[in-house]
A protein has these predicted regions:
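A contiguous, low-structure linker/loop signature
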Residues: 65-117, 136-140
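Segments that shape or occlude catalytic/ligand-binding pockets
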Residues: 32-68
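Active-site loop segments of alpha/beta catalytic cores
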Residues: 1-33, 76, 85, 110-353
Length: 353
């Protein structure tokens, strides 16, 4: 009897023998805005990944982006951080930092976790009902933090240069702020644990192009204890920890696993596929973030297929341990989107055929 999507995901994560590679496709709002009907023509030919998609579902004249993701838009989140959109369909930047001056900390009010997520309101009763409905349908129960829940939130609040100085000088108020953010996030984590989730995601970008942003020593001092505090209750209940981070993080990957991460969503070519194999394969499940800097946006369809095949052959196994994620952003042309979707479909069951 074939596995359900939920069973296959969990077996893949646990490396106990799945039947296909779980694959996740994210089409950015910017790509929708750029390609429109040309994108529709691609997606309609991939019902395996987009089973409910039909031409004409989107009204492009009425398409509106959240101010956070709209060129010229301004948005103040529940922490008081001010966001400005730069490009339609891509999340903007924070350039208003409510704790830029530490003197503001005494009067600073955290969001209320009972009613407020960082980016908007929350109705926990409604979410509980949604989770119950998903459980009844046999679906994977997944949840997670907002992107940028701790390290990035710190520089949203303080400003990047200020945060780097805080870490380097051992500013005592920094630990106070970290504890405040962790306490706020713990409430959210516990709500989902009480709902019986299968996997919980912690997402933020810890890496730059060639190395992690703060390095192993500063990560161990400032961030790892907070990660452990948030992740260990999940692990104690048998919940998988999915950790997304863009950028190079191989210099802190051991610490991430020690904190509790069981599924590492990391970028492929920044680290090198062979390095990922040598450092991670068999230790943690790899949710491979497929290149969106060179081959997929700028390569040929043949180069794209060769990349996907090589990654599946190198990192995959009949035991599982490999998932794949592709985020599609400009300037990826329609033919390359088609190529990456075709290749992902072609090699999804490579290890079981």
């Amino acid at each position: 009897m074939a596995l359900s999507d939920r069973e296959n995901y969990l077996r893949t994560a646990s490396m106990t023998g799945g039947e296909w590679i779980p694959m996740h496709i994210v089409v950015s709002g910017a790509t929708w805005d750029q390609l429109r009907e040309d994108l529709e023509e691609v997606l309609v030919h991939h019902p395996h990944f987009f089973p409910d998609f039909e031409r004409g579902q989107r009204d492009y004249d009425a398409m509106q982006f959240h101010p956070q993701s709209r060129a010229g838009g301004e948005f103040v989140d529940n922490y008081g951080c001010v966001w400005h959109g730069e490009v339609d369909g891509i999340v903007g930047i924070v350039d208003g930092h409510p704790l830029e001056d530490w003197d503001a900390l005494d009067g600073f009010e955290m969001p209320d976790p009972r009613t407020q997520l960082p980016l908007g309101p929350v109705d926990w009763d409604r979410i509980r009902q949604q989770m119950a409905n998903r459980r009844q349908r046999g679906e994977l129960l997944s949840a997670g933090t907002e992107h940028g829940f701790l390290f990035m939130r710190l520089y949203y609040l303080r400003g990047f240069e200020n945060l780097m100085l805080d870490m380097a000088t051992g500013e005592p108020r920094l630990q106070q702020l970290i504890d405040m953010i962790v306490e706020y996030t713990e409430y959210q984590v516990q709500q989902y644990l009480d709902m019986g989730v299968d996997v919980f995601g912690f997402a933020e970008d810890l890496g730059a192009q060639e190395k992690s942003v703060i390095g192993p020593r500063m990560f161990e001092r400032w961030i790892a204890p907070a990660y452990t505090r948030l992740m260990q209750p999940c692990r104690e209940q048998g919940v998988h920890i999915h950790n997304h981070t863009d950028g190079y993080v191989m210099d802190i990957i051991d610490q991430l696993i020690d904190c509790g991460v069981t599924i590492c969503n990391i970028q492929d070519l920044i680290h090198g596929v062979e390095t990922i194999r040598d450092e991670l394969k068999g230790r943690a499940c790899i949710d491979l973030d497929i290149d969106r800097q060179s081959v997929v946006p700028h390569g040929t369809p043949q180069e794209i297929e060769e990349l996907i095949e090589y990654e599946v052959r190198t990192l995959g196994s009949p035991r599982g341990g490999l998932m794949m994620t592709i985020g599609i952003y400009p300037p990826t042309p329609p033919e390359n989107i088609d190529a990456v979707l075709s290749a992902m479909r072609k090699y999804q069951r490579f290890w079981w055929e």
